[in-house]
A protein has these predicted regions:
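Short secondary-structure boundary/capping segments
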Residues: 1, 105-106, 123
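Walker A (P-loop) phosphate-binding motif
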Residues: 2-38
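Active-site proximal helix/loop that lines the substrate pocket
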Residues: 16, 41, 123
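Active-site phosphate/pyrophosphate-handling residues
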Residues: 21, 71-72, 119
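ATP-dependent small-molecule kinase phosphotransfer cores
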Residues: 38, 42-113
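Switch II (G3) loop of P-loop NTPases
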Residues: 113-123
Length: 123
């Protein structure tokens, strides 16, 4: 995929396959690297996402300090396929939008290549 003269490369693979090492090598050579897992972690703390998670799963998923209670969300979702599907329906659009925004910013900043490190790129 190209965006305004910027080549976008997707990097996927299992845990321990060397994605982080390869990402660092690309970054050392001037590529902008986007870590989809990191984007997801950051995005899950946005107020709009938190509000949507409360609507989907109740206030149980929010800590008293208004941050995401990741442990409780995991307990709710990771043993129930329907709830996991619902979690993905809620957060996926926000994550994709944030990744697209970061790609656009990198392209506008003159990046010739963006490496998207996304372990679940094909799901």
């Amino acid at each position: 995929m190209k965006r305004q003269g910027t080549v976008i490369v997707g990097l996927t693979g299992q845990t321990g396959a060397g994605k982080s090492t390869l990402s660092r090598m690309f970054a050392d050579r001037g590529a902008a690297v986007i870590d989809a897992d990191q984007v997801a972690r950051e995005t899950m703390e946005h107020k709009l996402v938190l509000a949507d998670l409360v609507l989907a799963f109740s206030t149980e998923v929010i800590n008293p300090d208004a941050t995401l209670n990741r442990k409780r969300l995991a307990q709710i979702c990771f043993g129930d396929r329907q709830k996991l599907r619902r979690l993905n329906e809620v957060v996926y659009p926000y994550i994709v939008r944030e990744i697209e925004d970061r790609i656009d910013r990198a392209a506008k900043a003159g990046a010739r290549m963006v490496l998207l490190d996304a372990p679940t790129l094909y799901e």
